[in-house]
Amino acid sequence: GHVGADTAAVVLSTGLGQTAELEAGDQPTPSPPDREWVRLVVDVGTNAEIVLAGRGRVLAASSPTGPAFEGAQISAGQRATPGAIERVRIDPTTGEPRFRIIGVEPWSDEDGFTKAAIGTGVTGICGSGIIEVVAELWLANLMDTNGVIGGADTRPSTRIEPDGRTFSYVLFDPTELGLDGERLLVTQNDIRAIQLAKAALYAGIRLLMDHLGIDTIDEIGLAGAFGSHIDTIHATVLGLVPDCDPDRVTSVGNAAGAGATIALLSGSARQSIIEVVDRIEKIETALEPAFQDHFVDAMAIPHRTAEYPCLSTRITLPERSTASAVGSERSGRRRRRNGAAR
């Protein structure tokens, strides 16, 4: 597996080892109040490293998310460099997008964007951008819970156009903003790549929750270069992580690097992490039969069965369709939609 020195450094810098050692009375009050505080930290990368602490235990696992979160396997994907779309909002009434690119302060619908973007251009979509656009497509009802763009229960939009046997969403058309460059589409294959990645991550988390015997998490930290830049609300909408109080889903930055620095500067910290590492229970996701079941359920957006009551206090979520089961439209075949504007 990929649980090693990086994970140990994350545990050190985030204090997960201390969380597991605290008595219930020394921790913030969870809900319900008769149980101990549970913390989750995820270092998001090609292999996500997951650490869950609570009930006097620390559990860790690695989940194979692949490179989609870093812009790879995405048709217009790229690294997080100037010109890359990093933030996206889609109007739920019109279906029209607005976005922000790295290196340019105004959003695409604000004065000054075109002038500022001439130097960089709009070159692609980075990891944080693809997370937001997929979540926004679902929130705007342009994509169904199975991840199908232009699904039978979604609403029509001129931004959705035929693309072979499926549909794609037009995120950027340079002619609309007076810029050079090519159109940027979000394709059905892009959606599927993100679904596979996020399902692997969620399944790994859920597996650790099963081993700890819990159904809720009180605090979530997103670590790593990618985890530091994604919007936590959109990450939860997509279903990267289980439901949690939105105020307690935060970025913890380069936790592995911070932990390495602490270990270099403190002998007592090095001794502490040695002791904690001996107590960490490593779970091999590949050997767990339940992993596949969790993975399949997590392919839906945000999830096939899990509820998100905490998230619902912050953002209005679409009603979950019961018309079709997850996987019923996995073939990706293009379907005609009545009244769809093309």
Q: How does the language model describe each region?
A:
Residues 109-111, 164-166, 170-185, 223-240:
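Short, surface-exposed loop/turn segments at secondary-structure boundaries that line and modulate
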Residues 44-46, 150-160, 216-227, 276-288:
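A glycine-rich phosphate-binding loop feature that marks nucleotide/adenosyl-phosphate handling sites
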Residues 7-10, 14, 193-216:
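Phosphate/ATP-binding catalytic cores across multiple sugar-kinase/actin-like superfamilies
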Residues 9-12, 20-23, 34-129, 231-253:
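Glycine-rich phosphate-binding loop of actin/hexokinase-like ATP-binding domains
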Residues 2-7, 23-25, 262-342:
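Acidic, glycine/GT-rich loop-and beta-edge segments that sit at the periphery of enzyme/chaperone cores
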Residues 54-59, 73, 206, 210-277:
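Catalytic phosphate/nucleotide-handling subdomain of diverse soluble enzymes
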Residues 131-196:
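Gly/charged contiguous loops adjacent to phosphate- or pyrophosphate-bearing nucleotide/cofactor binding elements
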Residues 31-39, 96-99, 112, 198, ...:
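Non-transmembrane, aqueous-exposed alpha-helical and coiled segments at domain scale
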